[in-house]
Swiss-Prot record:
Binding-site list for S-adenosyl-L-methionine: R100, D101, E116, R117, D170
The protein, known as: Ribosomal RNA small subunit methyltransferase J
Protein keywords: Cytoplasm, Methyltransferase, rRNA processing, S-adenosyl-L-methionine, Transferase
Top-rank lineage group of the source organism: Bacteria
Cellular component GO terms held in the UniProt record: cytoplasm
Cellular compartment(s): Cytoplasm
Catalytic activities: guanosine(1516) in 16S rRNA + S-adenosyl-L-methionine = N(2)-methylguanosine(1516) in 16S rRNA + S-adenosyl-L-homocysteine + H(+)
Organism: Haemophilus ducreyi (strain 35000HP / ATCC 700724)
Enzyme class, spelled out: transferase
Entry function: Specifically methylates the guanosine in position 1516 of 16S rRNA.
Keyword Ubl conjugation: no
Pfam family, one: SAM_MT
Length: 251
């Protein structure tokens, strides 16, 4: 991974702390840049400035609108993880990305542990969470329900002490569309990390951690993860959720 590290803020110590924590090294020839401004940490694709910057923002914008006016319990992901009545499962989001799916679940009431293996994305996610924790409206429930795990792979979680009702997987999968048709965040992500070619390896540790079910989000054209057919699937317009029930749930 190559990336430029740029500090546009007045807080040099914070910038250095981010670089050291996530073990990031500056490469002046890279076309992607991680930039700290006075308000947030953001990712820019320098050779495609029109794409704009990518940052994690739980407080306002799209996610705030989705929290206030979205489908809530009617959202496809809420149904997939099994939210029903008073039942709000604990969830490990093993491919957290920018935390959007996790935020939907947390806003409904689930406690979500986030795991993100790419250091740049994890840094963006941590920055977004830190700002959300300080917000007067959502700060309290965010601190209670959304936490970034101090690991970069779910295989590093202890199955005896860090299990959850549900493990959620949404691995990057190659898009059929030409790049110009793929939304900007996905284009930048693919440039940064590519597809999760080792995604099949996620399923076994996910099953070990999930006490009730593993939920895998897949494009409608993608095969099942690790060629293991799910217990059942829930389909949406362009995707499906493959659901693997734990042995105890099948009885």
């Amino acid at each position: 991974m190559t990336i430029q590290l740029i500090n546009e803020s007045s807080n040099t110590a914070k910038f250095q702390q981010i670089c050291e924590k996530w073990q990031l090294v500056h490469d002046k020839s890279a076309s992607l840049a991680l930039v700290l401004t006075d308000t947030r940490l953001e990712l820019r694709k320098l050779d495609e400035a029109k794409l704009g910057a990518i940052a994690v923002n739980f407080v306002d914008g799209t996610l705030a609108h989705r929290r206030k006016f979205g489908g809530g319990r009617g959202e496809a992901i809420a149904k997939a993880v099994g939210i029903k009545g008073n039942y709000l499962p604990s969830v490990i989001d093993a491919t957290a990305g920018l935390g959007r799916d996790a935020f939907v679940l947390a806003a409904i009431g689930c406690k979500v542990t986030l795991v993100e293996r790419h250091p740049v994305i994890a840094a963006l996610l941590e920055d977004g969470l830190t700002r959300a924790y300080l917000d007067a409206e959502i700060g309290e429930f965010m601190q209670q329900r959304m936490q970034l795990a101090n690991v970069h792979n779910i295989a590093q979680l202890d199955t005896t002490t860090q299990s959850a009702d549900v493990v959620y997987l949404d691995p990057m999968y190659p898009h059929k569309q030409k790049s110009a048709l793929v939304k900007k965040e996905m284009r930048v992500f693919q440039h940064l990390v590519g597809a999760d070619l080792d995604a099949d390896q996620f399923l076994l540790p996910a099953k070990a951690l999930a006490t009730k079910r593993v939920v895998v989000k897949r494009p409608d054209y993608a095969p099942p993860l690790a060629e293991q057919h799910p217990s059942f699937s829930q389909k949406t317009k362009n995707h499906r959720f493959d659901i693997y029930l734990s042995p105890l749930q099948k009885r």
